[in-house]
């Protein structure tokens, strides 16, 4: 895959107030290069079609920022769209002075001209921002667009793995490799759980030493797990870790029950927790789209995400509790407990993770969902993660959404959303909305 590149295209004509335009150009370059190291900028404003084409010959962008540095007619945008079809942000500069004198830039009319041409050429999902480079709202929107664009680019080189098949009745997480590739640019490969189990039992104790040390450092109370299960867990962790590294896997979904209890004798929960701490997005119950949701969240924040079921609603507190059996990344544990180790709540076999997740003033509940007609949509729920202890056996996080929690539950149940969600540590609503546009997906925001 080609190197990620964002191209800044300041288009205009030389008949407007060039001192004002030059000031806007210089401020824009400073802003864009401060927000991303991947932005390429021309040495000067592109004030003729010839200058535009010369610069277009020099670039190979995955993302475009078209700015009307002054008014420019539709030929500029048409030429750009003829050459490149990548996601685009159209940026209008605010008029610098309104004093009854000369119209300095006329950038807004240029935006209408560009947008009209882009729509006519089939591009109806470009992003748009209005304002000067120093305005906070403009900075925020451009930054969100750039971050979403980087994730969009990474998705097109992502290789996911489906380890085993979904259990009976969990088909919502089963993915077709062709659909993932077509919609997200993601490659999906499959491997049976049996293969990793067989690999796990083949290791020597010395070969597992590094994985054992990493687990002991991350977990609290692993030594209390029976030696047989502790050893089996470390071996399984090494098998997954080796497979991920050998095959360039960036995210995976894994079958868990009943196989790892009945055929292997030890759960995979804590293995997935360790992988999540290594920023390999890992979902249980073979939920490929859950793992994809986690991957997107991790790429936006650089942090592990929480994966779980919505299990409890408290109308008085306006909260929704998300829980799962024990796969949360150890680094998400509350500071006062650490990443405690326990046993699976149903099977009574360990090790699994046992803790409440740490609080966060900003959090986003997120899901890549597949509709019955085969199209995809995104659920986005901004809120915060409260300072709450473990709610049930396993791992949990209590989210207080900005929206009414009861309305969120009622609406999302009636809308047929899947029963697994990702809790992202951070407010990434705008980035997810920008990504939805880039992927041409429906986004449902609850706020």
Swiss-Prot record:
Keywords: Carbohydrate metabolism, Isomerase. The lineage of its organism: Bacteria, Bacillati, Bacillota, Clostridia, Eubacteriales. Belongs to the SqvD family. The gene is sqvD. It comes from Clostridium sp. (strain MSTE9). GO terms for molecular function: L-fucose isomerase activity. The keyword Zinc-finger does not apply. Its EC number is 5.3.1.31. One of its GO terms (biological process) is monosaccharide metabolic process. This is Sulfoquinovose isomerase.
